[in-house]
From Swiss-Prot:
<dbReference type="Pfam" id="PF00410">
    <property type="entry name" value="Ribosomal_S8"/>
</dbReference>
<protein>
    <recommendedName>
        <fullName>Small ribosomal subunit protein uS8</fullName>
    </recommendedName>
</protein>
<dbReference type="InterPro" id="IPR035987">
    <property type="entry name" value="Ribosomal_uS8_sf"/>
</dbReference>
<keyword id="KW-0694">RNA-binding</keyword>
<dbReference type="GO" id="GO:0019843">
    <property type="term" value="F:rRNA binding"/>
</dbReference>
<dbReference type="GO" id="GO:0006412">
    <property type="term" value="P:translation"/>
</dbReference>
<comment type="function">
    <text>One of the primary rRNA binding proteins, it binds directly to 16S rRNA central domain where it helps coordinate assembly of the platform of the 30S subunit.</text>
</comment>
<dbReference type="GO" id="GO:0005840">
    <property type="term" value="C:ribosome"/>
</dbReference>
<dbReference type="GO" id="GO:0003735">
    <property type="term" value="F:structural constituent of ribosome"/>
</dbReference>
<keyword id="KW-0699">rRNA-binding</keyword>
<comment type="subunit">
    <text>Part of the 30S ribosomal subunit. Contacts proteins S5 and S12.</text>
</comment>
<dbReference type="InterPro" id="IPR047863">
    <property type="entry name" value="Ribosomal_uS8_CS"/>
</dbReference>
<keyword id="KW-0689">Ribosomal protein</keyword>
<comment type="similarity">
    <text>Belongs to the universal ribosomal protein uS8 family.</text>
</comment>
<dbReference type="GO" id="GO:1990904">
    <property type="term" value="C:ribonucleoprotein complex"/>
</dbReference>
<keyword id="KW-0687">Ribonucleoprotein</keyword>
<dbReference type="InterPro" id="IPR000630">
    <property type="entry name" value="Ribosomal_uS8"/>
</dbReference>
Amino acid sequence: MGMTSDTIADLLTRIRNALKAEHLYVDLEHSKMREAIVKILKQHGFLAHYLIKEEHRKRTMRIFLQYTNDRKPVIRQLKRVSKPSRRVYVPAAKIPYVFGNMGISVLSTSQGVLDGSTARAKNIGGELLCLVW
């Protein structure tokens, strides 16, 4: 697929496909934004862990996927909200609660990439990047 114009959608698609294929991990090009999103997913138990590798001045990320004891993906759904063609911004009060609060929203804010509950607590809105549950 190469570098698409929407690296976040690409990240979510690659994770989705890897989970469908029951892969242990997925490798992709590193970016600060991608790492920030992956870090939040890991903090919330949606991903096992990740590594950043540097080879020939190229940084790649290896994301280790998380499965339940009976080998089902922990992530049910990854949904891109804001897109390069149609940006979606929300104030703190409009940050969605996801999947009966078992899921998370990820926002790009003036204070960096945050999960919805953190942004809500800080009373800051931002660009609604994606929903995960």
